[in-house]
Every structure is written in C-alpha cells, then in structure tokens.
C-alpha cells in the first residue's frame, strides 16, 4: 500500500518544478542557513568530510558548492595499469553485465532498450549490442564528480530531454524503461578498448548536469534533443581526456551508465549488484592482454559499506531519496 502511494507520487508530483526549486535553492548564498543545511545533510547521510579539500562546512558559500566539493588528491588512488579500466564514480552498482542484443538489465526481471537509452540512435546502439554495461548510482552522501574509466577521445555528445523520475529500488522495479525515459547526457568516446559511452542520467531534484568541455548542459530544459560532434584525436578541436580525469558532475543526483563494445572488456569478477564503488579502483580489464592481471578493488571498511548502503535508495527498505 505504501509503495503504491510512493509510486503514484512519482507520476503526480510536478517533478520539473521541484527540480527547478531545488536547483534554485541549492545555488543561493544564505550564510548561516546554508551552513546549517549542510551540517544537517552531513550528519544525516554520514558524509566523510575528512576526504574533502575543504573539510570545514563553513567554507562553502552555497549547497551546490558543497555538493560538488573536490576531494583531496590522495583519497582516490588511481590504478595506473594500462590494461585496467577504473570506476568512474563513487556510489553503488545498480546492475552490470552483458547487453543482450538490445536489452539492458534495469532490475531483476526488468529490462530496457539500448536503442531507446541512446535516443533512437541505432548506429551508436550497434556499437554496443552484446557488449557490457555497468550502472552506478550516486547516493546523496557521495562525491558527485564523474571521472574517466580510461583514456578517451570525445566524439559525440547528445542531450536527451526526458522525465525526472527518482532513481531508487521502487522505481527500478516499477517504472518501465526508467533510464531511457529520464533526462540524460550521452557521451561517446573512442578508447583503446573500443568505443565507450558514459551516460549521465538525471532524476528528481538533479539541478544540473555539467561536462568539463562544455560546462552546463542542462538547464535550460528546452525539450529538444541536442547533438554535438568532435573530430578524431589528432585534429584541431579534438577533446582528449585521460584515465581518472574528471569529465562531468551532477548538482544533486544521480546515475552513471557505462557501455562497452562486445569482446573488449571483462568486468572484475567480484563486482555485483550493490557493490560499493570508489573512483580509480578496478572496474574491468582488457580482453586483449597477454597475461590477465589479478586485480580486485581495494577492500573497504565494513562501516563504509554500511553507510553507503544506508544512503542508497537502491537497497530495499531503505530511504527512497533521489
């Protein structure tokens, strides 16, 4: 009964206006009130401020400044093995595995369309059919900048307008094609592991999605698909990003989906749904290495895993925040 009510709210509530209101409030300088809100947020979600470059909450002028806070250089060591792709975001893995032709796993027993996720771009979808995907959810407590899993040359970016459903266990189980319906920014890269897509998905109260090469992509929300292209690596105007380099950020929210071409990478065997992710840790290995490296993500303290799961609405019977 309660879940039915919560699900009904996803369709009834004015999600766009709530998102605009959240974005407006998060960008305002409110002095002591801003600090109070940040302090309450840190306490409620158990945010580890010792990792931040500026651990004092009084140093943030707005909530957005706090939300996209940079981390100290030493807290996310980068695995530099050239055969290894690394995790692009702090968070929890929602789902991962093989793309079955056009089907990507959204939740147990529920799939969505690869081509729909890519805004009907069948040529791009053809690059990833029967490939590999990883969906990472960033909870409110997480660092909200997104980094590169490997070196890449940006070739295409597509902004896709859409709904702003919350991303949580309930919606993943009950909203068909959730990630293919929500607002998103699709980034296509050429890499040494073949084509790779890194998709930043919005949700309720995700105030904005930004990239390092183009700044704020949304808002404004104009309701039309926008597409940009870039030349190959050696040409003037090309955009090259290094493994571990920041490529984008969320101001509130949400989800990152990675797509890899078939036969190019093997996901780290120990990773599964609800695995906790940390930027720079091993995500996958190349299939073309002569000797497969024996790598596993660094073990995390039990209290860190518990705090991440407590903050993640992907975990059933937990909070259903965005």
UniProtKB/Swiss-Prot annotation:
GO terms for biological process: phosphatidylethanolamine biosynthetic process. The active site is at residues 90, 147, 254. The record marks 253-254 as: Cleavage (non-hydrolytic). Its main location: membrane. Keywords: Cell membrane, Decarboxylase, Lipid biosynthesis, Lipid metabolism, Lyase, Membrane, Phospholipid biosynthesis, Phospholipid metabolism, Pyruvate, Zymogen. One of its GO terms (molecular function) is phosphatidylserine decarboxylase activity. It is an enzyme of class 4 (lyase). GO terms for cellular component: plasma membrane. Residues 303-322 have a biased composition (Basic and acidic residues). Is synthesized initially as an inactive proenzyme. Formation of the active enzyme involves a self-maturation process in which the active site pyruvoyl group is generated from an internal serine residue via an autocatalytic post-translational modification. Two non-identical subunits are generated from the proenzyme in this reaction, and the pyruvate is formed at the N-terminus of the alpha chain, which is derived from the carboxyl end of the proenzyme. The modification Pyruvic acid (Ser) is found at residue 254. It is found in: Cell membrane. Residues 296-322 are annotated as: Disordered. Its cofactor is pyruvate. It catalyses: a 1,2-diacyl-sn-glycero-3-phospho-L-serine + H(+) = a 1,2-diacyl-sn-glycero-3-phosphoethanolamine + CO2. Pathway: Phospholipid metabolism; phosphatidylethanolamine biosynthesis; phosphatidylethanolamine from CDP-diacylglycerol: step 2/2. It comes from the Bacteria. It is a peripheral membrane protein. Its EC number is 4.1.1.65. Binds 1 pyruvoyl group covalently per subunit. PANTHER family: PHOSPHATIDYLSERINE DECARBOXYLASE, PHOSPHATIDYLSERINE DECARBOXYLASE PROENZYME, MITOCHONDRIAL. Belongs to the phosphatidylserine decarboxylase family. PSD-B subfamily. Prokaryotic type I sub-subfamily. Catalyzes the formation of phosphatidylethanolamine (PtdEtn) from phosphatidylserine (PtdSer). Heterodimer of a large membrane-associated beta subunit and a small pyruvoyl-containing alpha subunit. This is Phosphatidylserine decarboxylase proenzyme. It comes from Salmonella typhimurium (strain LT2 / SGSC1412 / ATCC 700720). The gene is psd.
């Amino acid at each position: 009964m309660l879940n039915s009510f919560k699900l009904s709210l996803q369709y009834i509530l004015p999600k766009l206006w709530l998102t605009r209101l959240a974005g407006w409030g998060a960008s305002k300088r409110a002095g002591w009130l801003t600090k109070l809100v940040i302090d309450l947020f840190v306490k409620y979600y158990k945010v580890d401020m010792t990792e931040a470059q500026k651990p004092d909450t009084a140093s943030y002028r707005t909530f957005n400044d706090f939300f996209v806070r940079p981390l100290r250089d030493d807290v996310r060591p980068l695995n530099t093995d050239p055969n290894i792709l690394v995790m692009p975001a702090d968070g929890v893995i929602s789902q991962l595995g093989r793309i079955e032709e056009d089907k990507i796993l959204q939740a147990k027993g529920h799939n969505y369309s690869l081509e729909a996720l890519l805004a009907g771009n069948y040529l791009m979808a053809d690059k990833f059919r029967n490939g590999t995907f990883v969906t990472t959810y960033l909870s409110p407590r997480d660092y909200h900048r997104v980094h590169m899993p490997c070196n890449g040359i940006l070739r295409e970016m597509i902004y896709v307008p859409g709904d702003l459903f919350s991303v949580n266990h309930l919606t993943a189980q009950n909203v068909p094609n959730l990630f293919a319906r929500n607002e998103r920014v699709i980034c296509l890269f050429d890499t040494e592991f073949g084509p790779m897509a890194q998709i930043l998905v919005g949700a309720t109260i995700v105030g904005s999605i930004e990239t390092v090469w183009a700044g704020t992509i949304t808002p404004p929300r104009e309701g039309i698909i926008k597409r940009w292209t870039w030349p190959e690596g050696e040409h003037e105007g090309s955009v090259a990003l290094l493994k571990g380099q920041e490529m984008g950020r969320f101001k509130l929210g949400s989800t990152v989906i990675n797509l890899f071409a078939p036969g190019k990478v093997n996901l780290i065997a120990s990773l599964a749904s609800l695995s906790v992710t940390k930027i720079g840790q091993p995500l996958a290995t190349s299939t073309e290495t002569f000797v497969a490296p024996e790598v596993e993500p660094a073990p995390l303290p039990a209290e860190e895993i518990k705090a991440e799961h407590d903050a993640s609405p992907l975990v059933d019977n937990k909070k259903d925040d965005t």
